[in-house]
């Protein structure tokens, strides 16, 4: 992962900066990764995912589709050429058993798994994961994301 992203705190106050970060992130994710997205409601997790998936569509000459939060469906899935992207939102999940029933930890080198609200996931062994923690600063005016690889 480029040094500008790995284990760093990045300003994403504007949507433009969020989009730029998502674009950089696509150069790192090749398949087989799990990305955990932490942060309060409305801080930019789904916006980041939208720009990330749209960038994959763009670089593969595909029509950019509307990317929405899977808060109610729990999962939205996208096929981008030979890469599948699963976008989970676990906000409404209340137990570890419910997480186990979702079969989130499918291991596939052609799959990128993005998980919002991963707080109940405790058994992270045997998976390669990246943590993005989105934060508000200055009474919600500014935002940052901390990236841990």
Predicted regions and their residues:
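Hydrophobic anchor at the beta1->P-loop junction of P-loop NTPases
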Residues: 35-37
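Short phosphate-coordinating micro-motif centered on Lys-Gly-acidic
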Residues: 95-99, 105-149
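N-terminal pre-Walker A segment at the start of P-loop NTPase domains
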Residues: 2-24
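Post-Walker A helix-loop "phosphate-sensing" segment adjacent to the P-loop in P-loop NTPases
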Residues: 54-66, 80
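Conserved nucleotide-sensing/catalytic segment adjacent to the nucleotide-binding pocket
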Residues: 68-71, 75-116
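Conserved lysine of the Walker
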Residues: 45
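P-loop (Walker A) phosphate-binding loop of NTP-binding proteins
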Residues: 40
